[in-house]
Amino acid sequence: MAEVTLTTAANFIPEMWSDAILDYAEREFRLVNQVTDLSSMVSEGGNKLNIPKVTEETAATLSSGSAVSYGANTDGEVELSINQHVYEAKRIGDLVRVQENSDLFGMYAQSMGYAIAKKIENYIAVDVLQSATGNDVTLAADNTATTALIRSGLQKLLDGGHSYTDGQTFLYASPAFFSSILGLSDFTSATVRGDAQNPNVTGEIGSVYGMPVYASTDWDDDGGTGDESGTIFKTSGVYYASQLQPRVQEQYDIDYLATSIVVDSLFGATLSHGASSTALPVVNFNNP
């Protein structure tokens, strides 16, 4: 009787692992899908992407009988470096047996896919978004939101000429800051929002002033001075590019009677303006 072995299963095992891990990673991506993705521009190689910043133009009034004046702006640029190489690796013994156990297979695939997604999301949140300082709002108390403070953050976007009602503006909050928002009656009272959308019933905030709201542990809630407890940002505020989408590679190691599986990704992300620029559509809420 024919037997399915590591040799005969070799053709389908890598593909199945790849599909399962990448599918789970994609489901876990959230921030990546809410920023400006320029991956197609680095698909052919290169470790840096120079993105022109076109200077805002001001229309002039033409006087009768006068010639038009031509502008000669000096446009800047934003440099996006593809310099983050992250990975997750496991050595799994008796791979075919794991493969045949759907529960165990699912646990491994989810674990590896989640690790990659979490690493990329954490970089965008902590190293990019939370590095912005130009539109900071200082909270009155650690991890404590008020409607006035949120409106103050929105005003900073408006002062920079940005709309927050275009469906491309998001509010992320630490668990403690999110919990504080849940306690604001302006966003939770049934008399204000109606019972169908009332977080006191659903447990979900949904949106605040038209912005989707998400709780994330990538925002700190330990009460440290200056820590970012929440962030409002627009899609245009962050540039992201992945030169190597999460890939899965495997190799059987006869010395260990196990299969080594590695998932890795090569990417970069940066703010669309200088971190201290008030024109940057990113607002951080900082602990006092």
Say what each PLM segment does.
Residues 94, 173-175, 265:
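Short, structured patches in soluble enzyme cores that scaffold and shape functional sites
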